[in-house]
A protein has these predicted regions:
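Conserved N-terminal helical subregion
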Residues: 94-186
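Long, low-complexity C-terminal extensions of enzymes
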Residues: 359-501
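Glycine-rich FAD pyrophosphate-binding loop
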Residues: 25-48
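Conserved FAD/dinucleotide-binding core of flavoprotein oxidoreductases
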Residues: 261-311, 333-344, 356-359, 363
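Predominantly flavin-linked oxidoreductase catalytic cores and closely associated redox partners
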Residues: 148-292
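Conserved mid-domain beta->alpha element of the FAD-binding
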Residues: 315-381
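Dinucleotide-binding Rossmann-like beta1-alpha1 core, especially the glycine-rich loop
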Residues: 47-133
Length: 501
C-alpha cells in the first residue's frame, strides 16, 4: 500500500511562511498531516507595509482570523481602491476599485451600456458607476449591506508588515504548529527529492513534502535539480524598492496613492499610526545614493527614520514544484508591488497546492498540474502589472518611452487589442483581476475603444438610458451610506477626544 504524506516542512520567513504553515495545518491536519515550520531570519524592517487585495479576507476566514482584531493589531486600514496619478502627463488620476462581480444573469456587462452612452455624449465617467470607486472618493468603506442587491464591492488592507507577520506566527503556535528557527546549513537530496535539511545549530528535519516560502532566496528550490528562475527583465525596468515612513494622515483615506515619476513610481499606504512610503525605481535612472533624498519630494510628505533600499527581480521559477519541494509566494513568483498582489500570490500558491496536495509520499504527479496552473496564474498577474507600463503616456522620458516599447506577451496583446476594438476583456483561467479591473485600468490609461458589443444596439434606447441613470443613482446613494474609514476602524471617537475633528 502506498504511503501518504505525513509530515510537511515549511521553510521560509515572514507572512508567507506562517500563512502556508497555518493553511496546510487547517486544511489537512485532520487528515493526519503534521506541519513543521522552519523560520529563517526575517527580511522585514519597521517601515515595511503589506498592501493587499480583498482576496486576503478569504484566507483569514479559512484560518479563523478575526478581521477587527487583526486590523487593530497591525495598525491596519481598509482600502477600497488604488488611485493612480501621473502615469499619463496631463491626464486626470484614475481609480482601480474592487467591485464584486454581479451574479450571472445573461445580461451584458454594464461597461458596454456605459460605452455606448459615452460614444453618444454621456459625460459621466465609468468610475461614477463603480461602488468601489465612489466609496474611495468619499473616504468610505464598502461593507456588505445584506440587502441582496447586485451592487457590492470589497476592500483590501494596508498592514504593518512586521506586526502582521508576528500575529500570524502567534496564530500558528496556538494551532500547535511546531517551529524551529535558524539558517539552512545543508540540504540532503536523493534524486530529485529532499530527504532532510540541517539548520546551523545542527537540528535535522525530515519530511515527506517541503514548502519553500523563503522569498527571493529560494533556499530550497535552488538546490533542486533543474531549478531555474525566469527573469522578466525585458518587461519590467525597475530593479530597486525603497521603503520609509511618514506621519499618519489626519483623516484616513479609503485608497492608496500610486504616482509615477521619471524613473518609476511612489506609493503612499495609509496606516493608523503612520503612512508607509514605498518607491519602486530603475537604478540606472535614479541612483540609490540620491533616492532617499528625493523620496520626500516625490511623496510630498516629510519622511522620518531610515529609508531602506532593496533589490527586486520580477520573474518566476520555471517549475515551482520539483520532486517533493514546492515554492510558494515570492519564492515562486516575484512581482513589484504596483497592484498590491504580494500576499495574494502567496495565497494563490497555497490554495493551488492544497487543491492538488499529493495523494502519496512516494510519487507526486500533482507537480505537473501545479506548475501549469502557476504559470497561468503568474502570467495573468504579470500582464496586469505590465499594462500599467505599456499604456503609460509619459512621453519624452527615456524610462517611460522604453516601457511603452517593451515586448508584450501574447496574452496581454490579446487583451489590449480586443479592448481597443470593442471595450471587451478576454478573461481566462487563473485570473486575479476581473473584467472591471481591466476596464478601469485601460480607460484610465486613455484607451478609447473603437466600438462596443453590437448586441447593445438590439435593445431600445429608453430602457438603456433608464438602466444607466438608475445605476448612477444607486451607486451614489449606497456609497454615502457606507461608514467612513475612521468610523470603520473606530478612530472617530479618538479624533474627537483629541480635538482633531
Amino acid at each position: 500500500m502506498t504511503r501518504r504524506v505525513e509530515t510537511v516542512a515549511v521553510v521560509g520567513r515572514d507572512a508567507a511562511l506562517w500563512l502556508a504553515a497555518a493553511a496546510v495545518q487547517r486544511s489537512l491536519g485532520a487528515a493526519g498531516v503534521r506541519v513543521v515550520a522552519v523560520e529563517l531570519p526575517s527580511w522585514l524592517n519597521a517601515v515595511d507595509c503589506y498592501s493587499t487585495l480583498p482576496s486576503l479576507a478569504s484566507m483569514h476566514r479559512l484560518l479563523g482570523i478575526d478581521e477587527a482584531k487583526m486590523l487593530e493589531a497591525a495598525s491596519g486600514v481598509p482600502v477600497a481602491a488604488q488611485r493612480f496619478s501621473n502615469w499619463s502627463k496631463g491626464a486626470a488620476p484614475f481609480f482601480l476599485a474592487y467591485d464584486d462581480e454581479p451574479p450571472p444573469s445573461g445580461d451584458l456587462p454594464f461597461s458596454q451600456y456605459w460605452l455606448k452612452g459615452h460614444k453618444e455624449g454621456l459625460r459621466v465617467g465609468l468610475e461614477d458607476f463603480s461602488l468601489g470607486c465612489a466609496c474611495a472618493k468619499l473616504g468610505r468603506v464598502p461593507v456588505a449591506t445584506g440587502d441582496g442587491g447586485e451592487l457590492s464591492a470589497s476592500y483590501g488592507y494596508s498592514l504593518d508588515a512586521s506586526i502582521y507577520a508576528e500575529a500570524l506566527k502567534q496564530l500558528a503556535s496556538k494551532r500547535g504548529i511546531v517551529s524551529s528557527s535558524g539558517k539552512i546549513a545543508d540540504v540532503t537530496l536523493k534524486g530529485d527529492c529532499i530527504r532532510s535539511i540541517e539548520l546551523d545549530d545542527g537540528t535535522r528535519i525530515e519530511a515527506d513534502l517541503f514548502i519553500d516560502a523563503s522569498g527571493a532566496e529560494r533556499v530550497l528550490m535552488m538546490k533542486m535539480p533543474g531549478a531555474k528562475f525566469e527573469r522578466w527583465k525585458d518587461q519590467f525596468g525597475c530593479d530597486r524598492i525603497i521603503t520609509a515612513s511618514a506621519a499618519p494622515l489626519k483623516s484616513l483615506p479609503a485608497f492608496s496613492q500610486i504616482s509615477a515619476f521619471r524613473g518609476g513610481w511612489v506609493g503612499l499606504y495609509p496606516l493608523r499610526d503612520r503612512t508607509a512610503v514605498v518607491a519602486v525605481y530603475a537604478s540606472d535612472v535614479v541612483s540609490d545614493h540620491s533616492m532617499p533624498g528625493e523620496l520626500p519630494l516625490l511623496a510630498r510628505m516629510a519622511v522620518s527614520g531610515e529609508a531602506v533600499v532593496a533589490e527586486i527581480k520580477p520573474g518566476m521559477l520555471e517549475r515551482p514544484w520539483i520532486g517533493n519541494c514546492v515554492a510558494v509566494g515570492d519564492a515562486a513568483i516575484a512581482l513589484e508591488p504596483v497592484d498590491a498582489a504580494q500576499l495574494h500570490v502567496a495565497q494563490g500558491c497555497i490554495s493551488h497546492l492544497i487543491a492538488v496536495f499529493p495523494a502519496t509520499a512516494d510519487e507526486m504527479p500533482e507537480a505537473s498540474a501545479y506548475n501549469k496552473s502557476m504559470r497561468s496564474f503568474a502570467g495573468n498577474i504579470r500582464d496586469f502589472a505590465l499594462a500599467h507600463y505599456v499604456l503609460n503616456r509619459r512621453f519624452d522620458e527615456l524610462f517611460w518611452d522604453k516601457a511603452r516599447e517593451a515586448e508584450v506577451p501574447a496574452t496581454l496583446r490579446q487583451k489590449l487589442d480586443l479592448f481597443a476594438a470593442r471595450g471587451t476583456v478576454a478573461i481566462g483561467d487563473d485570473e486575479t483581476f476581473s473584467d472591471q479591473n481591466w476596464t478601469l485600468l485601460m480607460l484610465g490609461a486613455g484607451v478609447e475603444p473603437d466600438g462596443y458589443d453590437p448586441r447593445i444596439d438590439l435593445l431600445p434606447d429608453e430602457p438603456q438610458i433608464e438602466k444607466v441613470q438608475q445605476r448612477l443613482r444607486a451607486v451614489s446613494q449606497l456609497a454615502r451610506q457606507m461608514p467612513s474609514v475612521d468610523q470603520f476602524v473606530g478612530r472617530t471617537e479618538q479624533l474627537q477626544a483629541a480635538g482633531v475633528v
